[in-house]
Amino acid sequence: MKEAERKRKILYHQHLTSRCDAQTAARDVLALQAQFLRHAQMSLRLRTRDDSWKQWVKQSVKTRAFRGTLHLLDAEDRLLITSALWKDYEHRKYYMARYYTPQEEQLFCNAILDLLQQGICGRRKIYTRLVAMGLDEKLCELACSSWDGLFAVLNIQGKVMFQHAASREFAYAPISLRSDLDACRKELVYRYLKGYGPVTLRDASYFFGWKKKELEAVLQKIHNVQMSDCNGSTVYELPEEIDAYPRIPTAVFLSGFDPLML
């Protein structure tokens, strides 16, 4: 496969040369990285043919997803994405784990969930309540830090989510995670190939935050994955019946953290 052909396919699958409605675009790229809301909005606007992106953003779910970072994703995909990814953090493989023992973490998380269920959502208010419970003040501060602290852990576990796309406060919103981890990962990688292919193992490894061997094992379970050589690298894609892909634009001005760059 020539590099130009690969680029045409990727731009088409990313809806940068095949604009569509907002929900289709958002689901095909799986999620929009949202450290800055305006970047996620611009990424979606580039891929939509109308103003449907505005309503989609209002109805989207803001949560931590791929690589543990903030994303906007379609409400229909929250269960699949969270179920496929939360296991990556099950063994306390995140930065907050260095500050808390497992027992302390559980104590703080339970206290935060109780307060959220009472409708106390502001970080400062939750911090004040935790301190009033007699908990260690430094750990209370870390739990409610501007980097989301233990809220990030609860977010990744599917127990809380942000109140809306522009919010920095969380809401109690638990979901019953699927137990079929392998099936979830297979479905997610299949959709990744559909929206990002042709991809290299290195591309996929960065996107998911998984080791290449893990991804190879998942790819082997997906029916009809096609492999080609492109500039000395193996690329993976799904078969499709398209005679010709749109030409590569002279320039495409992307937002920060655009899915194409990730």
Predicted regions and their residues:
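Non-catalytic regulatory appendages
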Residues: 214, 225-262
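Intrinsically disordered, low-complexity boundary segments flanking structured domains
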Residues: 30-31, 56-60, 149, 223, ...
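A short, conserved structural fragment
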Residues: 57-70, 155-165, 223-230
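Internal, well-folded beta-alpha domain core
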Residues: 113-142, 191-232
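Short, cationic-aromatic polyanion-contact patches
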Residues: 74-78, 166-183, 234-244
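Loop-centered beta-sheet repeat module
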Residues: 140-216
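Short, amphipathic alpha-helical interaction segments positioned at domain boundaries
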Residues: 81-98, 175-197, 245-262
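Phosphate-backbone binding and catalysis cores of DNA-processing enzymes
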Residues: 1-136
